[in-house]
Amino acid sequence: MSVALTTLLLFVATAVAELVGCYLPYLWLRKGGSVWLLLPAALSLAVFVWLLTLHPAASGRVYAAYGGVYIATALLWLWWVDRVTPTRWDLLGAGCCLLGMAIIMFSPRSG
């Protein structure tokens, strides 16, 4: 598997872990869910942090690039979980963010 594909898949897995870790407390606080949702939420956020450590690039670069993938994944979450169709502007914005991620992660670096 190519480095670019591996990086993208790792970012998507990281975003899903973060989204789940934030959505479960939302269900508890706003939708009357059980307080027990906080346990899997904490586990999911721990997985999120661990996944961020798996990238070989400098942490600041990883965090900056990850943000682009998070935005695109959050829009998929909006569509699949919240059942709200993203607008063309949402999709254009996500495309710009993914382009930024690609520039940050895959541009040539000097020695």
From Swiss-Prot:
Q: Which PANTHER family does the annotation name?
A: UPF0060 MEMBRANE PROTEIN YNFA
Protein family per UniProt: Belongs to the UPF0060 family.
What are the TM regions of this chain, as residue ranges?
Answer: 8-28, 34-54, 62-82, 91-111
> Where found?
Cell inner membrane
SUPFAM superfamilies per UniProt: Multidrug resistance efflux transporter EmrE (SSF103481)
State the source organism's domain of life: Bacteria
Q: What is this protein called?
A: UPF0060 membrane protein XCC2880
Give the membrane topology, semicolon-separated if more than one. Answer: Multi-pass membrane protein
Q: Which UniProt keywords apply?
A: Cell inner membrane, Cell membrane, Membrane, Transmembrane, Transmembrane helix
What sections of the sequence does the record tag as coiled-coil?
Answer: none
One annotated Gene Ontology cellular component of this protein: plasma membrane
